[in-house]
Amino acid sequence: MSIEEIRKFSNEISSKINFDYDLKKSNWFNIGGQTKVYFRPDNLPDLILFLKKFGEKEKIHILGAGSNTLISDEKFDGVVIKLGKNFSNISILPNDVIIAGSACLDKKLSDFALNNGIGGFEFLACIPGTIGGGLKMNAGCFNKEFKDVLVSIQAIDKNGQVFTIPASKVIFKYRSNDLKEDLIFLSASFKGTKKNKEEIENEVLELKKKKDKAQPTKLKTSGSTFKNPIDQTDKKVWKLIKDSVPLDISFGDAHISNKHCNFFVNKNNASFEDMNKLIEFVKISVEKKTGIVLEKEIKILK
């Protein structure tokens, strides 16, 4: 890695670049070591310049809210990019179209839609991530996904080229899409429908009640660990885990939630190795018991 080149570049832009940056507080598991470079672009020109200069040279990982990421305790030999506050702007256009930056929290978009009397975004109140992360994995809950309200995506590639992708050109599947892995999402436009604010608010409250009843809250967890294996069985992944794994199993401080067994929890000071061992133990146990191979929903940064 050309650290000296990046240090020199950091003096040429207004955005902040940190070196040997601790990532532990940047994810919901509260697990992880350092990254050699941590770039938080405050504006698009700085991001374009960085990618044109280093996009092909460096290993790059985009970090959103960290609500779906497990980070290694070893130092990441690359660049972690976390888009700054100017990428979290949100605005409304005619015909009930909303544009949101990819660093915008899902809940912020849901609240904005509610305040403007636009329905269709209620489910986002229950997803604890950013717009960019939601687009990346076609996040969803309660039978609704990002693709259902998406109009278009603005993205940038590792060469610093910015372009717009209509939703109609993207093949979305369960928790995935066919877009190139190295794309960085900048913003997206979404379309909802006019709806009574009280109706929207009631639906949001109802969805939150369902979520809080079924899922752990205010704990160090990254949500669903594995995807539902929809191409192998109709059974939900939590049911497969419950039937295949002793739920009191733990590795260090890495435990299975007693509220939802597809949620793994750092009870105190679990290491990456602890959590990764738990994930692999569950994966192997389910395969041995059922023959079904689980795929991780959480992202691993190492």
From Swiss-Prot:
Enzyme class: oxidoreductase
Pathway named in the protein's UniProt entry: Cell wall biogenesis; peptidoglycan biosynthesis
Domain FAD-binding PCMH-type: 31-210
SUPFAM superfamilies per record: FAD-binding/transporter-associated domain-like (SSF56176), Uridine diphospho-N-Acetylenolpyruvylglucosamine reductase, MurB, C-terminal domain (SSF56194)
Keywords: Cell cycle, Cell division, Cell shape, Cell wall biogenesis/degradation, Cytoplasm, FAD, Flavoprotein, NADP, Oxidoreductase, Peptidoglycan synthesis
GO molecular function terms listed in the Swiss-Prot or TrEMBL record: FAD binding; UDP-N-acetylmuramate dehydrogenase activity
GO biological process assignments: cell division; cell wall organization; peptidoglycan biosynthetic process; regulation of cell shape
Domain of life: Bacteria
Cross-referenced InterPro entries: FAD-bd_PCMH, FAD-bd_PCMH-like_sf, FAD-bd_PCMH_sub1, FAD-bd_PCMH_sub2, MurB, MurB_C, MurB_C_sf, Oxid_FAD_bind_N
Names of the cofactor(s): FAD
Active-site residue numbers: R175, S224, E297
Compartments where located: Cytoplasm
Pfam families: FAD_binding_4, MurB_C
Keyword Cell division: yes
Protein EC: 1.3.1.98
Catalytic activity: UDP-N-acetyl-alpha-D-muramate + NADP(+) = UDP-N-acetyl-3-O-(1-carboxyvinyl)-alpha-D-glucosamine + NADPH + H(+)
GO cellular component: cytosol
Main location class: cytoplasm
HAMAP family the UniProt entry points to: MurB (MF_00037)
Family stated for the protein in its record: Belongs to the MurB family.
Functional description taken from the UniProt entry: Cell wall formation.
Protein name per its UniProtKB record: UDP-N-acetylenolpyruvoylglucosamine reductase
Natural source organism: Pelagibacter ubique (strain HTCC1062)
